[in-house]
Amino acid sequence: MIKIFEKRSFANFNFSIKMSKAQENLKVPVEKKEIGQTGRFVRENQKSLSFIGGAVIAMILIYIAYQKFYIGPREVTASNQMYVAQDFWAKKDWDKAINGDAGYPGFQKIINDYGNTKAANLAYFYLGIAYLNKGEYSKAIDNLTNYRGGDNMVAANALGSTADAYVELKDYDKAETYFKKAADKANNKFLTPMYLKKLGLVYEAQNDNKSADDAYKRIKSEYPDSPQATNIEEYIARVEAKL
């Protein structure tokens, strides 16, 4: 039996070699044909290809010039004008932070005048928080959701504040979505437990006590040293009594 098996294996092996060589022989002319066709295409369309290549290079150069000579100076100007509005914001003078005063622009004008700059992008965050504190929740949401930042702390704050605005509007489904995003985005021991606790409260408002229990228990297990964990057992006991 062993010898028969070996003979069959050897026969199959020889057959495979023959097939592989046959396939290689078949591929060669096809590959040569394809190469020839490519070369002919390049020769016949050399002018068009050169034009396309030149156009791409021109577009790259225009973009670099646009960034350097247009966006760059506007970025500096917008950043310089942000300082006074930020000072109003820090002092909780929300109206002046939004609209500015006689001498300096507020965040709204900075967005309007320098909308494609990093400074204007950050202004969306400041403006959203200002409207949130003024109780203008829809405007807060509009501005906070326009913020596109790479900084995790600011981005998490923007998401969490958006959730706060939805809570005030009693749109608990969207509040839940944004608190989840905020907790995940923050991914730290300071903000994440805070947003998890708020998420638990939103679940409770919707009578989803199981999900609330999960959120509170996550604080207990993952963030035991956070301020939110201090009395979290009371929250857990409360929702578990309703399960």
Model feature map: region roles:
Residues F13-A55:
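N-terminal positive-inside, membrane-proximal cytosolic segments immediately preceding the first
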